[in-house]
């Protein structure tokens, strides 16, 4: 059943947004009156959460501006859930869409996957470019709301290959351990993944990969495995075992509002403004930054517009959001001296999705939380790390689904089209081809080692075998050491910082949010030590 706010709840949403905007204005003035630099954090994903916690723990007051909803405060629907199951989408599922737009577009070539929904400020957003769709999380917590929770630390030698400008020993001794601890990362237990019916699909795909000589691994996750045990035995409300993944997760997943953001909010020094988009950023003659803000309600009705001035601005809107704002400012002259490298070195983390007909039972019960992967990773361009993704259709489809991360050497570039007032992305199937080739070689070997198996060509758009047109892992555009200095401050623009996936040049070999978190931890330590917010 679709959630439809009545007049009273709609008024509450509008009033809440207006109150949040007023609170931001008041807090900014107070911070300035007290002699503190006025600090804005645009976005509330991994980098923004780390920045907020680091600053507030040092006594700074910050304004955090988030374009989506505060789902922690959202009322539950009539079924007791605030978030949707993948098989039962509502207007809470997607960001202002008339219809869901999931990575799988059909089953057997038939339009059984996506459903019509109401338009509202739902959890999963889609940024569309000519040849690429980027999935993003919308709401307080950013991508942590909509991802599968796979929390993977990259192989150190590959990290050094991708980011030689950073001290790998420092990252692996200090910042990756800190990031994993603060995110609540844990390895999946054998009693769940190794034996339960919910992971039969993973065990089968791992066994078939082993016949081809490929290793499997249990992949750490931010899901509460003890909670999943209770779900399994019917002692807790099903969430990860109830089909909740990309449209949000009610109970088991340790999203940022339950971890790093919770710590920041507990200081009382974060002034959170939700349902508010930063539409432009301008650097004024005195070096301060003027932000144009637009606030809407859950249905998209305009609540108000405002202008706020800050001494320091932290861009944490994700690769797409951060690049869009900065490229617009560069093209219009709103911020002078932005580096020419802005928008470059972008990539989809080599994401390629593929499905196999596995010719054996995968199970009608499938956990929505991925916990295993198979790999041949050796840092070459043939490398593949393939997440064993669930297919929670409620029946045994005998399909193995994989989200492959490849070591594609190609990069894309964001540019600003002044005539259309929009950002464009230079990426196409030719640039994606090395990733497709690596994934094909990998999966060909698995099929050859398992007679009777084959590719499934009925799940993706245009009946593609290898889905190379979307990504969950947008990276790059404002790379550390190129567009920013080695601490994340934009070159030539003092007081402007980047603290999200834009810092990573296009790929990192694994699901990237642990790396984004670790780099943000490192950068904030250095920036605070250097007094850049004083």
What residue spans do the PLM features occupy?
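Conserved redox-cofactor binding core of oxidoreductases
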Residues: 129, 165-277, 461-471
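FAD cofactor-binding and catalytic pocket of flavoenzymes
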Residues: 111-136, 140-143, 147, 161, ...
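N-terminal glycine-rich phosphate/pyrophosphate-binding loop and immediately adjacent elements
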Residues: 34-161, 166-168, 321, 335-357
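N-terminal secretory signal peptides and thylakoid transit peptides that target proteins
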Residues: 1-17
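A glycine-rich dinucleotide-binding beta-alpha-beta segment and adjacent secondary-structure elements
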Residues: 440-507, 513, 517
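A conserved short coil-to-beta-strand element within the FAD-binding core of flavoproteins
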Residues: 274-287
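Glycine-rich loop(s) and the adjacent beta-strand/alpha-helix scaffold that form part
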Residues: 57, 61, 66-85, 281, ...
